[in-house]
Regions:
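Glycoside hydrolase catalytic-domain context in secreted enzymes
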Residues: 19-367
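Bacterial N-terminal signal peptides
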Residues: 5-16
């Protein structure tokens, strides 16, 4: 464990460049059916369509339904969250038929401790010390959520917390690293099943990476100042357990980590998560987190915030429109590389491929 801590210090903030379109994960010609499919699709996509895939939005005052449907038809939306009924999800997915490349949406929701059937809060589930019971609750949640047309759950929440003042204590599994790590893997496997493309499986988006439950003073979104030994020994293992269990997605936390917000933390999202831990999935910002880089004092404006997030390794931007607004301008100005956009787009398309949505966008909606 100490070797990991030292390695974390030495790596710094550098990471390998993202892959160019048309290459496999090793930088060589695509070797698998999945890589070939994605490379072929990306070769036909415009940059506007690639950036559209990075947009995760919900229907609401900021994104009225009719306007959002028009954006879907124009290829400007990658996924939807907080739409939870079959008729509404189907109506949104239907708009994809009118887009140029017909890239399906995925639909996500906070399925935390049940969907239609409500189980005890996560802290209560953890108090059972019964992994089988927790697995059954997550499997039932997956069955019910997928039956409503959902593809992804923003769950499990595996943030270790040892400060009862924090307002989200009830959403996690508590203070014990071993127990939280155990239940983290249990829930991921129960949600995703043996075949993520199955109609009754949903993708797990483990959250909040990282250290969200260690916010100073128990104040949500606050700073975290923590040594690497404590980080690796006490707080990071539950996220690692989710990655090892095959979690398809990771939601990035809103807090800072030793002065750098997680949403702009290249060491966290690229060097640790992808290079050391071998995570191959999708990274998603928390709600409005890219814009909040300004409030954290790291970014001077929306343009800077967008650049910092995409270069750190955040694939999808949740609900604000910073990526769609600023990525084209940053690319034109040479402030980001084409590889940054291609990497993020590839991760989104890979998640949709794994969910079976290219084979059948309606697989969780019935006929």
């Amino acid at each position: 464990m100490n070797r990991l801590c030292v390695l974390g210090l030495l790596i710094g903030l550098s990471g390998s460049p993202a892959l160019a379109a048309g290459q496999g994960e090793s930088g060589n010609p695509p070797a698998t059916d999945k890589e070939r499919f994605i490379a072929s699709l990306m070769a036909r996509m415009s940059n506007a369509e690639k950036i559209g895939q990075l947009r995760l939005v919900s229907v609401g005052a900021d994104h009225p339904k009719e306007a959002l449907m028009a954006d879907i038809r124009a290829g400007k939306v990658g996924a939807i969250f907080n739409t939870v009924t079959r008729p509404d999800i189907r109506a949104l997915q239907d708009q994809v038929r009118h887009s140029r490349l017909k890239i399906p949406l995925f639909h996500a929701y906070d399925v935390a401790h049940g969907h239609r059937t409500i189980f005890p809060i996560s802290l209560g589930l953890a108090a059972s010390w019964d992994p089988e019971v927790v697995a059954r609750s997550a499997r039932i949640s997956a069955l019910e959520a997928s039956a409503d047309g959902l593809d992804m759950s923003f769950s499990p929440m595996v943030d270790i917390t040892r400060d009862a003042r924090w307002g989200r204590v009830s959403e996690g599994f508590g203070e014990d690293t071993y127990l939280t790590s155990l239940l983290s893997g249990v829930m991921v496997r129960a949600y995703q099943g043996s075949n993520l493309a199955a109609p009754d499986s949903i993708m797990a988006a483990v959250k909040h990476f990282a250290l969200y439950g260690a916010a100073e003073g128990g104040r949500d979104y606050n700073t975290v100042d923590m040594s690497l030994p404590r980080m690796f020994q006490d707080y990071l293992p539950p996220y690692k357990a989710a990655v090892d269990a095959g979690a398809g997605a990771v939601m990035v936390s809103l807090n800072t980590i030793n002065g750098v917000p997680a949403t702009a933390n290249r060491w966290l999202l690229t060097d640790l998560l992808r290079q050391q831990w071998g995570f191959k999935g999708l990274t998603i910002s928390d709600h409005g987190a890219v814009k909040e880089l300004i409030k954290h004092g790291l970014a001077g404006n929306e343009r800077d915030a967008t650049r910092l997030a995409i270069q750190a390794g955040v694939d999808m931007n949740m609900n604000d429109d910073l990526y769609s607004t600023w990525l084209p301008r940053l690319l034109a100005a040479g402030e980001i590389d084409q590889a940054d956009i291609d990497r993020a787009c590839r991760d989104v398309l890979a998640a949709k491929y794994d969910l079976g949505l290219f084979a059948d966008p309606y697989r969780r909606l019935g006929k």
